Amino acid sequence: MKALQFGAGNIGRGFIGKTLSESGFSVIFSDVNQNIVDAINYNREYFVKIIGSNQNKTVNIKRVSAINSNDSNIKKIISSVDLITTAVGPTALEKIALIITQGIIFKIKNQFTKPLNIIACENKIKSSSFLKQVVLKNLPIKYHDYLNKYIGFIDCSIDTIIPSINNKDDLFLTVEEFKEWIVNINQFKGAVLKIVDMKFSNNLDAFIERKLFTLNTGHAIAAYLGLIKNYKTIQDAISDKKIRVIVRSAMEESGSVLIKRYNFNKNDHLDYIEKIFLRFENPFLSDKLERIGRNPLQKLRREDRLIKPFLGAFEYNLPYSNLAKGIAAAFYYHNKNDLESIELSSSIKKQGLESTIIKICDLPVNSKEVYSIILEYNLIKKIIR
């Protein structure tokens, strides 16, 4: 069995590539970073250190190779593999879709009918379904029947933390023991692939939003509040009592939305929040706040980790004040090394805060949602002082 993994970064190598290799796949990584591509092809293996609650261990990931995403030979690889996975970030999916489309056309023209399943592992709800729609837009209509018959786009939810830790070995990664990969079993074409620790669900939306509204929401709010106070790591931020209270309260507010929407058991969900806090506190997974908080425009979109649970609270008439504090912190934060942060700060300066919130978050003009964010923005220094 062969798999093509777009993205040879932390999640690509430390979670997806590792899991697929352990499941018996030969894994081909595709990335635009030629240095990473060369390193993988030179070593043909890499090492991953797993940090657990009781013990740590290092595993050797073998049967790996790599190709630059701009290499024209990638379409041949796409036509021959059993599985394609991605971990490139939601904003890069449209570029990946163009590459996948060319591979599918090559597969069709060579009359290959072996099913191909594609799993986009991104922090975007139903990212594989989104990827499918972009592929269909670029694929000639005469090939649509083939795609619907032989190409599966499987939506998923992934949950793990892989921090960026400097190491002499560019391929070496440190990962947490906890990992979760849940997929929609109904979207596979052909036989369902056997992948270690992969879980199947008929109610994937609930798991996707549980992870997005809890891990991602808490992570982002801790990062933006912590960065405003000049903290460096997630552990530093969570150790601050005021930040800790806001983050936990925000996760409980988003949790109330999940409980209302999906009928989750309240005590079970509070236990889930507690487990995530323990993961945040793990000193061996010291994650930098700049990494967690990067790309604020993406994180402030209507369907992402901050605004979606916030709007859910309004929808069900539930508390939202701590979610609003986290959103305000994202608008307040500025990083001169982050292009999206620069763009966000520039918009606030030129267009004003209210107009920027309405535009970036796609919120109604003169709405309670917008004014609640503005209120918290104006109080942000008092909140965390």
Curated annotation (Swiss-Prot):
What keywords are annotated for this sequence in UniProt? NAD, Oxidoreductase
Key word Endoplasmic reticulum present: no
Write out the catalysed reaction. Answer: D-mannitol 1-phosphate + NAD(+) = beta-D-fructose 6-phosphate + NADH + H(+)
Which Gene3D superfamilies does the entry link to? N-(1-d-carboxylethyl)-l-norvaline Dehydrogenase, domain 2 (1.10.1040.10), NAD(P)-binding Rossmann-like Domain (3.40.50.720)
Give the matching SUPFAM superfamilies.
6-phosphogluconate dehydrogenase C-terminal domain-like, NAD(P)-binding Rossmann-fold domains
EC identifiers of the protein: 1.1.1.17
InterPro entries under this entry? 6-PGluconate_DH-like_C_sf, 6PGD_dom2, Mannitol_1_phos_5_DH, Mannitol_DH, Mannitol_DH_C, Mannitol_DH_N, NAD(P)-bd_dom_sf
GO cellular component terms given for this protein:
cytosol
Gene Ontology MF annotations: mannitol-1-phosphate 5-dehydrogenase activity
Name the positions where NAD(+) binds: A3, L4, Q5, F6, G7, A8, G9, N10, I11, G12, R13, G14
Q: Which domain of life is it from?
A: Bacteria
Q: Which GO terms describe its biological process?
A: mannitol catabolic process
HAMAP family documented for this protein: Mannitol_dehydrog (MF_00196)
Similarity comment = Belongs to the mannitol dehydrogenase family.
UniProt name for this protein: Mannitol-1-phosphate 5-dehydrogenase
The encoding gene is mtlD
